[in-house]
Amino acid sequence: MSGKVHGGKGKSGAKDGGPLGSQSHSARAGLQFPVGRIKRYLKKNAAGKTRVGSKAAIYLTAVLEYLTAEVLELAGNAAKDLKVKRITPRHLQLAIRGDDELDSLIRATIASGGVLPHINKALLLKVEKKTHK
């Protein structure tokens, strides 16, 4: 026998060609947004000696990532409808104000967003139907 065989990762990292060293909280949770940064902000803004659990930071990060993806998808659709390839603040405005739930959630004014196209029904010309006698 040539000696002892040890298991585990050891100093060189994971076996079988896997990722080396440690993994970030975001990678473990399968998220793109930074869990560590969100946790740091939560801890910094917590009142007094309030403790912040790691699952709270992961959950908040997942919610922020979902809302961002939702807004970007709707803004991308608005840009595609206007046949442009770049999302502008106008597209964000159209996307947010066009969705009732996002409109109630995001009440902020978007710079360079413009206004929604709307004409009051009282201002439209009334077209009378001609009846055949």
Swiss-Prot record:
It is found in: Nucleus; Chromosome. Gene3D superfamilies: Histone, subunit A. The modification N6-acetyllysine is found at residues 4, 9, 11, 15. Its main location: nucleus. Keywords: Acetylation, Activator, Chromatin regulator, Chromosome, DNA-binding, Nucleosome core, Nucleus, Transcription, Transcription regulation. Residues 1-31 are annotated as: Disordered. GO terms for cellular component: euchromatin; nucleosome; nucleus. The modification N-acetylserine is found at residue 2. Acetylated by ESA1 and/or GCN5 to form H2A.ZK3Ac, H2A.ZK8Ac, H2A.ZK10Ac and H2A.ZK14Ac once deposited into chromatin. Acetylation is required for function at telomeres. H2A.ZK14Ac is acetylated at the promoters of active genes. It comes from the Eukaryota. Pfam families: Histone, Histone_H2A_C. Variant histone H2A which can replace H2A in some nucleosomes. Nucleosomes wrap and compact DNA into chromatin, limiting DNA accessibility to the cellular machineries which require DNA as a template. Histones thereby play a central role in transcription regulation, DNA repair, DNA replication and chromosomal stability. DNA accessibility is regulated via a complex set of post-translational modifications of histones, also called histone code, and nucleosome remodeling. Belongs to the histone H2A family. This is Histone H2A.Z. The lineage of its organism: Eukaryota, Fungi, Dikarya, Ascomycota, Saccharomycotina. The gene is HTZ1.
